[in-house]
Swiss-Prot record:
Monomer. Keywords: Glycolysis, Isomerase, Manganese, Metal-binding. This is 2,3-bisphosphoglycerate-independent phosphoglycerate mutase. It holds the Pfam family Metalloenzyme. Substrate binds at residues 125, 155-156, 187, 193, 259-262, 332. One of its GO terms (cellular component) is cytosol. It comes from the Bacteria. It is an enzyme of class 5 (isomerase). It catalyses: (2R)-2-phosphoglycerate = (2R)-3-phosphoglycerate.
Length: 510
């Protein structure tokens, strides 16, 4: 018999925060007999998943990429958001070699600089201040033709909140005396991550060919027209602003999203040789720059190269001869693999992965259970087989259904999670295994904006639950953060903590 319980399952309930407020709280409204029993029976507490505790600016809500990086690294990982913001403040951004090389080449040839990005203050995939800085950089370096192709948010921000961001950029271009917003579309089209190429195709043709479904004299007018059509920010259809603009050979294109997962598909359409996901009417040869590295396989320079993380949990388990399973449905598969492994695509030795397809629905309020039951089937099977020392699972429901803003669907999502967690803990009891239950950030515990009365579709800064489900006597240390979770797993496995992991165990065995 092994010295420590096996398997140890880390259950990450994506978007499942804790709030004492019952109003518009899908967790409070749901029937959760399993969650209630676990909290009544086992050591539990709350840990932080936002702000500087996860390497983000103070007061910045956490997100799935950041959360999983911290969970897997066992140390606070200073995020690309923070790196870029600091570089702008310090002035280093304006000396960035990758961006300047592309811009200077375009300027020397009398060509345009196109800026792509999610125009919002959400801070999850991008930040509007970074886009302003990019416009300033292009103007400083002599670009006369500067075009912003703005993707609208409404997901990490309220559903109809884009106008102040548009006005901020209009004012920035006016101040610079050059540049303008050339197109608008919702992130639903430009930032897909599930191979829904028909959406990406519309965004690509809008940017490259100036082919929009609608045209407006100004970006604000284009936005208002979309609202009148019943479209919120996320779903704004392809709209050209003023005289339509095309991307030409020799232009520079800088994609200002710092988060990789929703920037990859559109980037591939621009730069991938032999791209075949849809027919490109034109494929201009441009100087394309990614703000960060969206994937090692994408043939384009990154302004901010990835910072290597060593001895992350997956790597350290492999070094110690332990086996691990990573499992999630499509929406969160990258998080439980690439991001949890510190930005590494390949599995470690002894690591196996299971990808369960996410349901093919337009929005997940239409199927709030998503693929959680199928994910759970595979986990229960893995527990019963006792093939793995560690199982790491992400359940997407709280986040993905929370993002829809549909309260009744969010309640159903929480109830689905409760059932699934019950099945896992029951299977673990039969084999003597243990579990840690936590989340990466909040979302589903706040489904309405108290100030505006609109649906609250964004993440929150609320703490997240942490439960140790095991037979060993233990207490929970207060003041924990996501970076403390990996050291906690090592403690429960009886493994020493590597020096690179600066987090501290949350579960103190008695």
């Amino acid at each position: 018999m092994s010295a420590t319980p096996k398997p140890l399952v880390l259950i990450i309930l994506d978007g499942f925060g804790h709030s004492d407020k019952p109003e518009y709280n899908a967790i409070h409204a749901a029937s959760t007999p399993v969650y209630d029993r676990l909290r009544a029976t086992y050591p539990h507490g709350l840990i932080s998943g936002s702000g500087m505790d996860v390497g983000l600016p103070d007061g910045q809500m956490g997100n799935s990429e950041v959360g999983h990086m911290n969970l897997g690294a066992g140390r606070v990982v200073y995020q690309d958001f923070t790196r870029v913001t600091k570089a702008i403040r310090d002035g280093e951004f304006f000396d960035n070699a990758a961006i300047n090389q592309a811009v200077d080449k375009a300027v020397a040839a009398g060509k345009a600089v196109h800026i792509l990005g999610l125009l919002s203050d959400g801070g999850v995939h991008s930040h509007q201040d970074h886009i302003v800085a990019m416009a300033e950089l292009a103007a400083r370096r002599g670009a006369e033709k500067i075009y912003l192709h703005a993707f609208l948010d409404g997901r990490d921000t309220p559903p109809k909140s884009a106008q102040p961001s548009i006005e901020l950029l209009d004012a920035a271009f006016a101040r610079l005396g050059k540049g303008r917003i050339a197109s608008l579309t919702g992130r639903y089209f430009a930032m897909d991550r599930d191979n829904r190429w028909d959406r990406v195709e519309q965004a690509y043709h809008l940017i490259v060919d100036g082919a929009g479904q609608f045209n407006a004299a100004s970006a604000v007018e284009g936005l208002q027209a979309a609202y009148e059509r019943g479209e919120s920010d996320e779903f704004v259809k392809a709209t050209t602003i003023g005289a339509p603009v095309q991307v030409e050979d020799g232009d520079a294109v800088v994609f200002m999203n710092f988060r990789a997962d929703r920037a990859r598909e559109l980037t591939r359409a621009f730069v991938e040789p032999g791209f075949q996901e849809f027919e490109r009417k034109r494929a201009p040869q441009v100087g394309f720059v990614m703000l960060t590295q969206y994937a090692a396989s994408i043939p384009a320079p990154a302004a901010f190269a990835p910072e290597a993380l060593t001895n992350v949990l997956g790597e350290y388990l492999a070094k110690n001869g332990k086996t691990q399973l990573r499992i999630a449905e499509t929406e969160k598969y990258a998080h439980v693999t690439f991001f949890f492994s510190g930005g590494r695509e390949e599995p470690f030795e002894g690591e196996e992965r299971i990808l369960i397809p996410s349901p093919d629905v337009a929005t997940y309020d239409l199927k709030p259970e998503m693929s959680a039951p199928e994910v759970t089937d595979r986990i229960v099977d893995a527990i019963e087989n006792q093939r793995y020392d560690v199982i790491i699972v992400n359940y997407a429901n709280g986040d993905m259904v929370g993002h829809t803003g549909v309260f009744e669907a969010a309640v159903k999502a929480v109830e689905t999670l409760d059932t699934c967690v019950g099945r896992i803990t029951e299977a673990l009891q039969k084999v003597g295994g243990e579990a840690l239950i936590t989340a990466d950030h909040g979302n589903v515990e706040q489904m309405e904006d108290e100030c505006t009365g609109q649906a609250h579709t964004a993440h929150t800064c609320e703490p997240v639950p942490f439960i140790y489900v095991g037979k060993r006597p233990a207490r929970i240390r207060e003041g924990g953060v996501l970076a403390d979770v990996a050291p906690t797993l090592l403690t429960l496995m009886g493994l020493p903590q590597p020096a690179e992991m600066t987090g501290k165990t949350i579960v103190e065995l008695e």
